Amino acid sequence: MIVVQSERIRYDTNVINTMRKGEFAMRAQNLTLLTDLYELTMMQGYYENPSDQIVVFDAFYRKNPCGGAYAVCAGLEQVIEYVRDLHFSPDDIDYLRSLHIFNDDFLEYLRGFHFTGDIYAIPEGTVVFPREPLVKVIAPIMQAQLVETAILNIINHQSLIATKTSRIVHAARGDGVMEFGLRRAQGPDAGIYGARAAMIAGCIGTSNVLCGQMFDVPVKGTHAHSWIMSFPDELTAFRTYARLYPTACILLVDTYDTLNSGIPHAIQVFKEMRAEGIPLTFYGIRMDSGDLAYLSKEAKKMLDAEGFTDAVISASNDLDETLITSLKNQGATINSWGVGTNLITSKDCPSFGGVYKLAAIMDKKTGKFIPKIKLSENEEKITNPGNKTTYRIYGKDSHKVIADIICLVGETFNEDEPLLLFDPIATWKKTLLAPGTYTMRELPVQVFKDGECVYHSPKVMDIQKYCKEELNTLWDETKRLVNPHEVHVDLSKPLWDMKHALLDKYHFE
């Protein structure tokens, strides 16, 4: 393990205070040093032992998060921004020099460093499964090595939050789910990009105003208990809020007494609005504490009795997919859900186990890729070698996902011929699909070609629409929250043969 400490001179506070705001913004966008130290020490090793090898790295994950049977891929737009701006600034070079572990020649090389390779990726919002490459980097080895940490950091975080959100939205059974987690997120970036991922996976809005501005997504919110407490009484607080926001009048009713004060006062305000001819276009109550199942049913009775049958009954308070499912099963009349902590932190499953592994090295003489494999005592950690792509297989009549198949680039398939699938771990398991019973779609798209971005990132709300379409291709059994049916990710025969040839080779060596 290398342990180093910078001898860099501390910035003068007055200098920092006089820097232009834009300079900070530009510096924040250059994330080239958002990497683990060993990426840079390996790069210097490649530089000192000249290697311009073209390699293939795959970013993938091994196990579905949150006990589910799928994940929702997210974060590609931020990966693109990172790669586009990949360069070492003079400040970066100065800092690396201060560590006293990098040679001057190598640091000089870094001054002109930029990405020149190819990247293929599965589009955001796509439902994905273990072991299939979410991002594939084909580039000179130093470039491909450097981008590992940032790619995993971005994809792991946003895919985790998107997957967790998808489960919460599924539990809500068509009710609106709002992302309310900014104040509980692990820092500003986690709040902003976590909210972005939540919108991709189906939230109807976020409380995060900066996220709304950055990604053009709906922002939503009501008021806090402090609003009520700042007035002489609850009724005055409600009346004032209703005058300000008559077309979005959701009143928080649990500051003092939900059933004996909050809801009766809310109903009184709604009656006054109705009497004054104010259209009740979007109105209702929110509860943030107590027995939400019981309180919501009582609230529904009280609202219906006064003719407010279309009032929104919204709930918050440490919600997640398990609690929402329980409330639904108890007959709760809640039809709008504000989910914060457990969504933005993915509290019960706080990590997405994405990894980044070398899969092939190009033979300079032939231009063909030489497959590479990582072995392990744990068979699930044995990698799939070669330059690969992934196809999704659907039932021709059902249009539902049957399986995914990982294959070598260049393989062709004919949907009018039988298709033989090989389990990557249980080698005795094979599946034969009859001709004419399935359709196939290649998942990855090219994002960078020779260092230039060739992909247009869709808007977040367009990604959300695509994600909903993706989720509709899954059987209900795959989307259930407990003990779901898993979709198989199989190997083609050529890839299966390649993998087992390498296993045999290294076994006997």
What are these regions (language model features)?
Residues G176-E179, P218-G221, A248-L251, Y283-G284, ...:
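Structural motif
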